[in-house]
Amino acid sequence: MTMKKSRERHGFRATLALICASATAATATPLVAVDVGHTLQAPGAISARGRSELAFNHDLARKVVDALHALDVRTVLVNADGRIESLQARPASVPQADFFLSIHHDSTNASELTEWDWMGTPQTFSDRWAGHSMFVSTRNPDLATSLLCGRTIGARLQRAGLMPTDKNARRRAYLDAEHAVHAFDNLVVLYRAQQPALLFEAGVIKHRDEELLLRDEARQQRMAQEIATGLKACLTAGR
């Protein structure tokens, strides 16, 4: 073999190795399924000013997808049209995802609500509770990653000044009190998922002041960026 042919073969092998490495890196990029909680037929809680939880969920889920894209994390939006009726069908529709994140907004017990009039329409509110919280299931096949991602998201949110609520500790035990991660073992979208999964409650829409914050686009973007940053850190740790 001539020296020229040897160099050509070596160059080809080097190029092939680079292509393979690039393909491997692309494959290793995590895929996050972002689920819009609730449906058109069952739109969830109604805010203090009469807006459906589904509308809040859709707005934030879209921003989380955009924030993940900005960090070069692949995403798939689940229930974008609000028509997936089955909770089990949500994670089942994305078996290839590396993580399942379900976006929700919180309400308050009926016994804690007060009636008021908003723009001529009777509504209900409670200003007792405000803040985000998270849920994972110990029945999920990868509880460790589910909990780790909850912790990293919680840490990022609090570092940015977005504080959690302890409202849900009345019914759901903490797995990590500092970062507001609770156990919700029988929540279908969490334990039916084939991948680590977390349900995120962005805030309490029955709280009149927090509702306005949760509707603010700049704050939604800020929250989405912290969620995305925490989630990427969790999913790429050690890769």
Q: What are these model-predicted stretches?
A:
Residues 29-30, 99:
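Accessory recognition modules or surfaces
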Residues 24-28:
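Sec/Tat signal peptide C-region and signal peptidase I cleavage site
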Residues 4-15:
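Bacterial N-terminal signal peptides that target proteins for export
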Residues 13-23:
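Bacterial N-terminal signal peptides
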Residues 30-50:
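Short glycine-rich His-centered loop
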Residues 55-239:
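Active-site-proximal helix/loop segments of hydrolytic enzymes
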